[in-house]
Amino acid sequence: MTLDEALHYIHAVCWKGSIPGLERISALLDKMGHPERTLKFVHVTGTNGKGSTCAMVASVLRQAGYRTGLYTSPYIVRFNERMQINGEQISDDELCAITEEIKPLADSIFEQPTEFEMVTAIAFAWFARRRCDIVVCEVGMGGEFDATNVIGAPEAAVLCNIGLDHTEVLGDTLEKIAATKSGIIKSGCDAVLYRSTDGVEAVVEQRCREVGAALHKVDFTQLHLRQHSLEGQVFDFGGRENLHLPLLGKHQLHNAAVALTTLDVLQKRGWNITEDDIRQGLSRVTWPGRFQIIRRAPLFLIDGGHNPQCIQALAQNIADYLPNRPLTVLTGVLGDKDYHCMYRSVADHAVEFITVTPDNPRALTAQELAKYLVSFGKPVTPCDTVADGVRLAIDHAGKDGTVLCYGSLYLLGDVINAVD
């Protein structure tokens, strides 16, 4: 099986979308001999920040000498990004071999698995074969009925910032969404919670009581920023001082506090993580596509934020890191997102918009988005391709200007390739 054949097979079931339920993934893993049962996990859910939190925890565990798996979604440039061990993506050969082995098993069960279930099974098989000491695993959507929740009790169940997203599936209130996400908390694990509303916290507390899990609420009162620049941030948290984080934005400090609380939990559970491991691991973390600088002249930043909380964080980052800088905004968006919110918060900082079409069937075309954006009274230029949009944005910004690309994670891979 070639890489194209493997990816075609995996993506061929994507028309099913994301179907909650553990029956299909359980049946498939049973035929595979349950590789997930040989692994230990840190299981991470939330509306925003879960990928960044996963990256921080995994970076520290790797620094501590553990063979650390990392499972996240979506990818930015290459599919293989979704599963990594100690920072190395799965190879094409390994991806093809495991997919070829799993294909007849998946085809033989009562209902074909969804794309996300297939990818999850492939990742678990790879992590088990490579004998990972621990896997940091990001939930796909929700928690209780997400394919990743087929695992047993994790070392830590981490609930990052909870907001209103995927409401048609997860529920239309924060409490309903929290109830679904708290389904990853199981008997015998420790739960870590990003502080939230009283209603959300009550839901999580109830779940912990029901299953007998210890709950650790992140104490953001101990979080203090010392300094920040486009090179990173220096902060204190929980008795640790002068920690360096290369990821930008106040929201990333909150994610770091969640990661540090999780690492404290792991230390108490017997994982050998030193203070130097924590400092070095945090200082070396990478997480692409989140207010990330990909070019310096002009300054070119990309951000994958696409829901109201992410856009609020982006607007704050613009104020903190790019004050009084006129922005050439390169953008594309999916039609089912709240793109009105996306642009209201950023339009005042823009001198012009350049629109492109993300590589996704749900995307607004560049022309459709341009028609909407003219209402902000700024020049708008639709482009036929992402590469054309990148060239135009760089040209219009000039070497001393600033380009901000945001609107959809599905846009960023093509932008990175075009800039390179």
Name these PLM-found stretches.
Residues 22, 26-37, 63-152, 170, ...:
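ATP-dependent carboxylate-amine ligase catalytic core
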Residues 194-195, 207-229, 246-250, 278-284, ...:
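Beta-strand->loop->alpha-helix junctions that form or flank phosphate-binding loops
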Residues 408:
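Active-site-proximal loop/hinge segments that shape catalytic or ion-binding/gating pockets
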Residues 38, 134-137, 145-158, 162-163, ...:
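Nucleotide phosphate-binding/pyrophosphate-handling subdomain across enzymes
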Residues 111, 118, 131-138, 154-242, ...:
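Acidic, Mg2+-coordinating active-site environments of NTP-dependent enzymes
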Residues 197-207, 211-216, 231, 299-302, ...:
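C-terminal helical cap/extension that packs against the catalytic core
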Residues 1-48, 52-67, 76-77, 190-193, ...:
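N-terminal leader/targeting and accessory segments in enzymes
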Residues 131-133, 324, 398-400:
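Short, high-confidence coil segments that cap the C-terminus of an alpha-helix
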